[in-house]
Amino acid sequence: MALGQYILVKLETNRTRSSRLLNRYPKIIGYPIYATDFLFNRMIPKLSITKRVYFFLTKGKSRVLSLSEGLARLFSCGFEVIDYIKIGDETIILSKKIKEPAYDTTPTYGLLVKLDRIGQNGEILKVFKIRTMHPYSEYLQEYLFEQHGTKDGDKIEKDFRVTNWGRFMRKYWIDEIPMVWNWVKRDLKLIGVRPLSEHKFNTYPEYLQKKRVRYKPGLIPPYYADLPHSVEDFFEVEEKYLNAYEKNPIRTDLKYLFKALYNILIKGERSR
């Protein structure tokens, strides 16, 4: 397909499919039908040992995707999403070809993912996490940031890439447990600014970018010590921490560690 051409994609999302099946039949019939459809058209296509057989038999015609994965796959194939609308049981997506496909051989697909993050001296780190988003979600980050911005300088507002079980895991930091391995490898220190994706890093003011890359990122960010409520507050919190760390690293990290633990354990602060 040539650059500049438009394409309309018709998609029945996983939520629409589940609602359609469960509303069509009585519960005693609907739930077994939905479970079978979920297994065959959503899980089997994702498993490496079964997906080839699935696509050979179905050509992918009945495969079920989330809205997030559907949009993200278009971006990964070099398309820009112009707009999308839900009509009945189908979502219609208008897209424009703007570049060549990414040909990504390692998209965020499995349970455990390795994410590229900016580390000390601007080096790229492979950070380990449990996947809490729909597959290919990294391709939607810039699009959603432009559409919704952030709610507190950290997380994207109205981020539909996050799954229901992913929200629970994020709330209690379960998804970040594999990052302990990065700490063991000394890619990260215990307290420090959060390792960022390239896109997120580039949204920071240049002066703060330069300060960030002087030091290793951390497992526990200063966010949980000072609890910012806006983008401006978020930048100020990070700058305040980095300035203090530059003057007295050990005392600063101990201060922020105990303050973060107090907010989490005593005041009940959770990931937002």
Where are these regions (language model features)?
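Hydrophobic, helix-prone linear segments
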Residues: 1-9, 13, 158, 164, ...
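Conserved class I S-adenosyl-L-methionine
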Residues: 3-42
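Hydrophobic structural segments characteristic of membrane proteins
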Residues: 119, 178-272
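Low-complexity, charge- and small-residue-enriched intrinsically disordered regions
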Residues: 34-63, 260-272
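Short alpha-helix
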Residues: 50, 55-84
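A hydrophobic, helix-centered structural microdomain
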Residues: 87-140, 250-272
